[in-house]
Amino acid sequence: MSLRQQARGKPCMVRIDGGTTKSKTQLRRQAIQFDQLAEALQYNPQSGVFHWKKRLSNCIHAGDLAGNPHRGYVRIRVFGHLFPAHELAWRFSSGEWPEQEIDHINGIKSDNRICNLRDVSHAVNGQNQRKARRDNKTGFLGVIAYGDGYAAKIMKNGKTTYLGKHRTPEKAHAAYVKAKRALHEGCSI
């Protein structure tokens, strides 16, 4: 297993003078003042889009769309620091960096309208999953092939609840969605 695979899901911590540790996210946020961000970028909360306010290089001109897609999200490099656009949108709208994770309520990773963003815990953010993982053979969230039928299962606070065996994956998925709406506060499906 590579170091990158081992570190996935764990915040990368950096030791600084005095023995304290900070995550790379904390260091990145502290490295740039909001005034600098506001000088360089303009955010439209209704569209969720950032534009450059001034020319920063030969490639970046005033009025150009800011950011590049990366795994469905938009990332913006400002003064040498790479920021997720949804974190910048939160900062521009609330005046503060998010305390936890920013969740896209409608599940569209590139939709950075402020009405689509919320600051939630990692657990709640994970509860807003809308699609089955790529390795799920049934193609339905919360459903596994089980003998000659399909079983639905849901997890909350580390505890798995069995939702029954069903003849079709659609019926098992319907049972999962019903339980998800009742159990998961982050659920928006």
PLM regions: where:
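Short arginine-rich
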Residues: 178-189
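Short, cationic Gly/His-enriched loop motifs
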Residues: 40, 45, 55, 79-158
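A short, exposed loop/beta-hairpin motif centered on an aromatic-Gly-Thr core
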Residues: 159-169
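Intrinsic low-complexity/disordered segments
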Residues: 2-3, 23, 83, 101
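An aromatic-rich alpha-helical recognition segment common to small helix-rich domains
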Residues: 86, 143, 152, 169-180
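Short, surface-exposed linear segments at secondary-structure transitions and domain or protein termini
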Residues: 68-74, 92-97, 169-177
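Short helix-coil boundary/hinge micro-motifs
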Residues: 2, 12-78
